Amino acid sequence: SVIIDAVGKIGNGEVEINRITKTVLVIDEAQDMTEDEFALVEALIRKNEDLKVVAVGDDDQNIYSFRRSNSRYMRKLVDEYGARTHDLLVNFRSKKCLVEFANRFWETIPERMKQSRIISHDQDEGEIRIVQYQSPNMVIPLVQDICATPLIGTTCVLTQTNWEAIQVACLLKDKRMPVRLIQSNEGFRLCDMDEMRFFNRILGSQAEVHLIDEVCWAEAKQAIKNEYCEAASWEICRGIIQNFEQLYPCKYRSDWETYLFESKLEDFYAVRGETIVVSTIHKAKGKEFDNVFLLLNDNRDLLGDNQPVTDEKRREIYVALTRAKNKLSIHLN
């Protein structure tokens, strides 16, 4: 991979020192580092004696082990490099009872880096409902409950699998509820979208031109709007372009290409109050909603049965619980 090759070249002295001389290295979502990514961090540390490393992360939210990520690499910065830890303990998102509920749940997660409880900035009480089923047939009653619940603000239904998310979205649509299914771009890059290919063709691809001309950019924006404004994908395309404009006032072609390569489709779904968002827990990480309905089908282990539960699954559920701002409704069997 690119990262492994980079680590090898840095270690062998094949990279010009000015290309890797850094003063500060900031690692966001540090709990999701893989072995290769941590090897790159270590290579940069070895080549920069005075390098300051700032790692921002929450080991309770490491839910991407299927991508070989592990929070132990963030912990290594403390254990092997003597990094100091600063716990950010005030929650500005959720109502008081939701924060307390999440606190009680994370007590079941072993070997956590944080030991102090989270404190809610908002002292108003929210609402928690737990609906227990005796059957695995939970999707239809869940949808009925959603339709019968007065909803104010943004709403999301969280599921554990894509198939559950599709079922919920289809049933809500059948009930004539405004719904949006969050999908991901696993298996392809945003630059491979037909809409982005069209945009890039209008933009031009002269390799010798590093800075994108503002006139060309505006023409490409107008062209993609004219071509796709009636398409279901237009809102996502507009979000991709607008977000890049906010991040990069000076539009370099290399920045645009890297941005399309690294961005995830689920980051550009607009959330409107009247639309019910349906998503797997993994795709909703980093997002927040006023109302959250959580479908936990067949997690009998949480009810005290003998079926084992992994730490990964507990962290996944913790992530789901902490998406809610005001109301949390858990449907489980």
State what each model feature region is.
Residues 199-331:
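Conserved helicase C-terminal RecA-like lobe
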Residues 11-19, 139-149:
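Short amphipathic alpha-helix with an adjacent loop that forms part of the alpha/beta core around
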Residues 186-200:
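RNase H-like two-metal-ion nuclease catalytic core shared by retroviral integrases
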Residues 2-5, 167, 236-239:
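Amphipathic alpha-helical interaction segments
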Residues 24, 31-124, 134, 141, ...:
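Conserved helicase motor core of SF1/SF2 NTP-dependent helicases
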Residues 1-25, 33-43, 48, 257-280:
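Conserved helicase/translocase P-loop NTPase motor core
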